[in-house]
Amino acid sequence: MNAALIAALLILGALTLDATAYSSTCERIPCTNNSDCHGPDLCQCRPPRGDDFGYFCSEY
């Protein structure tokens, strides 16, 4: 039981680490076009997804 719990926590930690943003300067900055997004070249103004209503800078 303990080994299964430890393995599950390690897998969850690895998945969470992969889901973190690459650049803290790019994520979740409100924008109207790509020039508003200062940061890496991959940082672009993206349309809203889901319940978001505004455009935000993102690397994805």
From Swiss-Prot:
What cystine pairs are annotated? none
Keywords noted in UniProt? Disulfide bond, Hemostasis impairing toxin, Platelet aggregation inhibiting toxin, Secreted, Signal, Toxin
Subcellular localization, as worded in the UniProt entry? Secreted
Summarizing the function annotation, the protein's role is: Tick salivary platelet aggregation inhibitor that plays an important part in the anti-hemostatic strategy of ticks. Inhibits platelet aggregation induced by ADP, thrombin and thromboxane A2 (TXA2). Blocks platelet adhesion to soluble collagen (most probably through the binding to alpha-2/beta-1 integrin (ITGA2/ITGB1)) and binds to purified glycoprotein IIb/IIIa (ITGA2B/ITGB3) in a dose-dependent manner. In vivo, reduces thrombus weight effectively in a rat arteriovenous shunt model and inhibits thrombosis in a carrageenan-induced mouse tail thrombosis model.
Tissue specificity remark? Expressed in salivary glands.
Name this polypeptide is given: Ixodegrin YY-39
What is an example of a GO molecular function annotated in this UniProt entry?
toxin activity
Q: Which organism is it from?
A: Ixodes scapularis (Black-legged tick)
Its main localization is secreted
Q: Which family does it belong to?
A: Belongs to the ixodegrin family.
In chain numbering, motif Cell attachment site lies across 49-51
Signal peptide (UniProt feature, chain positions): 1-21
KW Transcription regulation (keyword) present: no
Q: Give the CC-aspect GO terms.
A: extracellular region
- Tell me what PTMs the record reports for this protein: Contains 3 disulfide bonds.
